[in-house]
């Protein structure tokens, strides 16, 4: 069945053709809203309407498009999509007619972030019915308008990543991060071997890693700044707009910023995190361009000899989302064997979190599945958030915990923040009480008492949440809202935020230091190397005199990459070209009169200033 929408006479192929002026459209039901539900309000310049396809391979017909006698060689369209996989096929005369071109839509960042993208077409003249058909669309792709070109355009090209398996005996450089001595902002020491004991086998830590920082256009809204400017009437952005709860230490970045990805990988590996768990739980959207950029960067780091966490996917708790994502990820990743070294394995198969109860055996047998949702525990569950004392998931026996969760905070709507303790969120939270991270400490202490195989930590880098209009009586920050007040669910401000990634506000790296502390208590830590007596070093003699000096301190090499990346919402370009000293090895020696310092640089370029604090260990 075809649905007539509007009748056209002749359409000039070289003028702007509004996508909503189609003459017919395929009859696929979208979101249960009816067969003609292809239109929505467009936030592109000029407003109006746009058409969209939501995972349904929709097509639109434009009748009597006149290409004239001077042939068209190109196609240009105003599109929005964040999947990086949707194709828009250009077909002549019937839906089964010749395909004259395919626009491979490159992610624009968000569903209403618009870009003009182009592709060449088979030279075309005369009058034709034109069909535009979306294919391979794992998310939501939208079209505002299009036109044809007399010239061959520069084709919009998706990023591609090369891959060759690492050697079977590959081992990364061991910098012994579990032996590093550290003190946090509160003056509390991070656990070492004396407190944590020796390393324990079969203990793993995963952390939720989010993929929401995608926007190339728009405004940056930061609730911490807005509340500071006007606490009682903050100037929030438009409804359903992402707001940061605070500013990341790396500025307002996008998930494809490789400078940030590299530092995330080092921070997490050094803290003892084994696996980053990509949050693809949102209605089956794969966020492909973003996790692909992250995974490829992790692979590049391993090629350079650097250790990194591995990865897995969280596909939500709905069967529809898990079914779509399992099929998509199998086809585009796991069946190819690509990045196999980075797959996090559980019971001999790649771990996937999701609801596999209605999944075909073809995919169910490829992965080890565990259900994973907030406040849920029990058989074959990997909970990601719970109230203290947290429940746990089990596999072999209900008496043997397999996995439990630890969260930094919960939700602004449930009024459970960083200071939540004993079932109560304090009425008057200060920076000092927030910085104590009471909820985080209590959750870790209970998780340690359970002693499972796996601890799922929430979270690393969510950073944003959308603002919504409240219904009468909506809970938010411990009070009832009036209708149409604004509220936020997951993230709101420093107290109600779950991100362990360091911020540039008063929280700094406190949560990160506590993460490292408790992971050592869970997994154990190697002993710090002991100093082996005094050594007198002559500056005029060979470096070989340092060979017997212990301990040695090692740094990751190749980690002084520069930065030049578009910021979130395109508000600026983030540039950092300060990388110089690529430290390799450091040692300290002493005798009765002097201290001696040895610094080896990977790139033979050193500018060093020493600020020495001598203390008794």
Spans of features found by a protein language model:
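Sec-dependent, cleavable N-terminal signal peptides
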Residues: 1-8
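Extracellular carbohydrate-recognition regions
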Residues: 8-34, 526-554
